[in-house]
């Protein structure tokens, strides 16, 4: 990823977080944290990685709500960011947090056995 895509991704991360938490009124969208935004070099596609606080049903509901609000989020991004074309948004669950928690639990279990 080039420098411009990185800078735009960081700004998009902040803006999407604000839009999802403050502007989108869908009750299905729970407490979410956007961990990263990866853009293609031509800025046409943005993969938004996020984590959701809650169980599997709440995660699924949040993703359904985000898919439904995708057009609204893109229009808000268009008014907030100075880009010629607003990238297509793809939302994906960031499993690195869960993986890190699993490793942390395993390390704690090893220390308890000693």
From Swiss-Prot:
Subcellular location: Cytoplasm
Record has Hydrolase as a keyword: no
Example GO biological process: maturation of SSU-rRNA
SUPFAM superfamilies for the chain: Ribosome-binding factor A, RbfA
Keyword entries, A-Z: Cytoplasm, Ribosome biogenesis
Record-level GO cellular component terms: cytosol
Entry GO MF terms: ribosomal small subunit binding
Domain of life from the UniProt record: Bacteria
Stored InterPro entries: KH_dom-like_a/b, RbfA, RbfA_dom_sf, Ribosome-bd_factorA_CS
Family: Belongs to the RbfA family.
Quaternary data: Monomer. Binds 30S ribosomal subunits, but not 50S ribosomal subunits or 70S ribosomes.
Described function: One of several proteins that assist in the late maturation steps of the functional core of the 30S ribosomal subunit. Associates with free 30S ribosomal subunits (but not with 30S subunits that are part of 70S ribosomes or polysomes). Required for efficient processing of 16S rRNA. May interact with the 5'-terminal helix region of 16S rRNA.
Name of the protein this chain belongs to: Ribosome-binding factor A
Protein species of origin: Staphylococcus saprophyticus subsp. saprophyticus (strain ATCC 15305 / DSM 20229 / NCIMB 8711 / NCTC 7292 / S-41)
Organism taxonomic ancestry: Bacteria, Bacillati, Bacillota, Bacilli, Bacillales
């Amino acid at each position: 990823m080039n420098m411009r895509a990185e800078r735009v991704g960081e700004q998009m991360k902040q803006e999407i977080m604000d839009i999802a938490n403050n502007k989108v009124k869908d009750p299905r969208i729970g407490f979410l944290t956007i961990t990263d935004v990866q853009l293609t070099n031509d800025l046409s596609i943005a993969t938004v990685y996020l984590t959701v606080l809650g169980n599997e049903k709440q995660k699924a509901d949040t993703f359904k709500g985000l898919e439904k609000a995708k057009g609204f989020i893109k229009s808000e991004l268009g008014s907030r960011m100075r880009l010629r074309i607003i990238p297509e948004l793809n939302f994906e669950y960031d499993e690195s947090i869960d993986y890190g928690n699993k490793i942390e639990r395993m390390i704690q279990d090893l220390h308890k056995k000693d």
